[in-house]
Amino acid sequence: MVLQGPMSQESISVGTQVRLLQQPSYLKTADAMSMLRPPDLIDAGEIGQVVALKALEQVAVRFRRGTFLLELKQLETL
């Protein structure tokens, strides 16, 4: 596994494949009315696809069990 270095919103775009580095303490859905979800819906190392760029270094990532808002520091590009 090769880390690409610190990610920024300039280095990532919609459609980029990313891997979750570690399981967060909770998940926030990327719906219009967000909800907090338990962290066991996705596992560390799971691969997802960026579907939207958000403010404050956050991205919406689609995994097999849902689309969630995550900080860039929690992800690595593939």
Describe the predicted segments one by one.
Residues 2-78:
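Basic/aromatic-rich interaction segments and small domains that mediate binding to polyanionic partners
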